[in-house]
Amino acid sequence: MFENMNSFRQSMQSIFADCPDYICRQLSLCGADAVVLTIRELADKEYIADSVIRPMLEKNDWSGFRGDFCAVLRSSKIAEGGNADDIASALISGSAVVAVMTDRLYIAVISADSYFGRSVSEPSTDVTVKGSKSAFVEDIEKNIAMLRKIVRTPKLKYIDYTLGSETETRVSLMYIEGRADMRTLERAKKMLLSVSPTVITDSASVELITKERRWGIFPSTGSTEKIEKAASLLVAGRCLLICDGSPFVLTLPYVFIEAFQSSEDYVRTPYYATFVRFLRFFAFLLALYLPALCLILVEYHPDALPSDVYGVIDRLRADIPISLFDELLIMLVMF
């Protein structure tokens, strides 16, 4: 802890050396010394002026102040300050720090982060004809609020984690109590607690560190930008990983059949959605096995084809310098 105001200011100044956006404002109070610390553009200047600085200047006598910031400041998000590292982390997160010196030094952390991101808009990757036109944004608080607006139950829970020793990115694990599979939930908690990455900038970074098989060809987590799709997966018993700063939400566990599903399926009738998914799966099997079937019939079992059909194929391939296998391989690689 800090002995006096000078040691506090010097300690914070040394941490934020060569940081021109670090602001330390000293206030002239009756009976006390006070400072307000912020990081420019991270904290809301109007909120700090109205809810922090103005009430402090309006108080006539500070000599009897003993740390009751809630009775002075007009803010509902006030926490007690800790050591220098905790205060520095709070400042970087957009909070304001108030220090008042009377009989001893009292420190408070006020949540005053300023949001500078885009508003809710249409998704850019998963465009649908029917259904909601809103998508997730880069603000984790807005994303959680939008999910709560759809899944209106107190059983919707989430656990916050801080990942990245340098970035300290907030990641939330969301699930519905009673619906989510407990083994999946415990496995996700264990993965998030066991990893110690240096930098987390996007949900793609979270996907990499939570991948069970590092060299596996199939993904272990899904990704969606659509709010109603994420809500439907929550109700179906899935878990969500929401990363602050990313408009894409990770879903787990991810099964192979989800690759043939669309966000629009969740707003269609069950019969129609099942039929369309069956068509997608059939088209996948057709694209997978049709080249092999063509190679087998033409190269190894020409007697299974009608003679006139095989004659046409043979004449068309007479001037091609590569084999049918090489031709099909090139076609599959290119398309």
Where are these regions (language model features)?
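Core alpha-helical transmembrane segments of integral membrane proteins
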Residues: 264, 270-335
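Membrane-embedded alpha-helical signal segments
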Residues: 1-289, 307
